[in-house]
């Protein structure tokens, strides 16, 4: 049976494990390659090979369920088919993969597995050769009878095909040209049988056994076609296709596959997908859509692009947590302890979370609230959201919205677009795997807007408790219930949030911290965290509270603690260098005992390496200056108030409260008012309003020196330092009046006074916002007297008691009260006019 011209495969073959089907000798099959080992085989062997030998690979059927593929190599089937890779096509959609066109050559047996990585290689034993069958007829006897029966059945099958006469004739010539010994493999590959049955044919090494395995398959195919033909005679209007012809490569001509309507249970996993759909516990509307898509999927050939799109859609649908949820932990005492351990202060936020837990205990069907934490950077808005999730025992997912300017990021893309995908909300639910997580919508005030739509408008449905129970993502196109999701948004300011979106959220202000709170936070959380991050222990580094307070006051100026943590990290790095150098010295070779005393000092001095430091290293103000350099901020308030025409105001920014200097000077001119400092329209109007009020009350406060007009022959220049920063708002009105009154009267404003408040033309002081942040900024600057509008008295309750005790608050209802409080000894007045009360 040997042949000089027969194919001789190498004794060592790389193995391609496939679950797409069973490759038989003499047939051609397309194989999709996407696993790591198979991808590496294609890249290293097929794409880089230059000889015919490099294109011969061993194809091993993988009997393992593809769903359970893992990094481990599955147990190999003992019999495989050596194949010639005649075509390799790569693609990146929907994921990176290769499609191989492989022609089966002969069987082989795996003798020994030589290696598993990067792809398996085995020592193989060749079992048969396709060319050997061309040298003679099969032996007489039972084998000859089997081969003749098989040939006659194959001819009968071809004659039953519902095709044109030329095609049938061509198939008949193909059967006649093939050696009868090759018919079992070729016909078993052509007809639609299960992988298990094809595997039995592959395992039949003996030719007689092979005929016995393949003949029943061919007979069953013929009986099925006879039944279908009878059915068509009874129902002539039935235009269903009895079978279809698929072109493909085959030896020696072309291969034809007979495709029945019944799907292959092993090779096609749509049945598995259907079971997943039914087990996903979807709502009725979603289930109807999925079943409809499944029916379409079964009718599609896998080569259609829409097949992959539909399959990806169904896989997304079954992976969503339609009915999976976590059980909330409603223990209020445990929640209070956990929140207190995670975050210091933030009493308002903790109170709101505990209220939610209490109501959930009384009403289990309570919808999740929509909270919005508004405050300066670094105060812990994002981290408190994570703590809330831990408190409730829920999954946590953060969605960064800063810079998002496409509404498709929220609502997803429609499936008609190439590369369509769900929005961030649905993707987040898929990631956490439950339908009641805590979603943190970070930086919601920094949403953009573009030609692709407004994402803030897309959030209106998501954040509306009356609508989000039927949120419809464009990709899914079916409603999804978001009512059990706890949404928490964070923002630095509400000014840039659209009013309609802001109205849907419960806004909780998160103000900045006092110095005492920062010290406590540093020693409870920041210092232990930085010690752990830098590999240090409390026995190696200690930062006293006085040093922490010095870092806060002289090296940071912020409402939060982010910059404080960076400075503590810088201290830890400097100490880590000392500790590492000391360990290096201590590990160096120790001198002998007789030379230890005279050599120790000289070694350290000569090498220039410091001796191991004494533990613990305590950071005092001297060490702090060596590490962080000279102080970045100094309390310069008293130095800048040495001339008339300077006053201190209080401003609110998204970064927290700030003190703001206002400077004024006068010169000869034509009564003009000049404003500098990059001011907004509202602040410019406040300056003109202050000038008008002072001009109308110049005689009352003895400011005109006998002239008819306060500004006669005089120009006034009003400047707000930090000119690179845009400034606007009405709260600087009282500061401008005080500054101009100081300039025109020649009297100094008290150096420990700061003020805020809006003014009217009648001299009333109206309330403003951001009182707590402004007061904390004044406290950081060591100011002692704070002038605020009388109607802001209620806001003083939010200020910590220790801060209130350090400050003297003046509640002013009129500008007369402001001027009397801003100057030592009060501000002189010619008459005692009655107080005007605001009824606005």
Swiss-Prot record:
It comes from the Eukaryota. Its main location: other. It is an enzyme of class 3 (hydrolase). A motif (Microbody targeting signal) lies at residues 838-840. HAMAP family: lonp2_euk. Belongs to the peptidase S16 family. This is Lon protease homolog 2, peroxisomal. The lineage of its organism: Eukaryota, Metazoa, Chordata, Craniata, Vertebrata. The gene is lonp2.
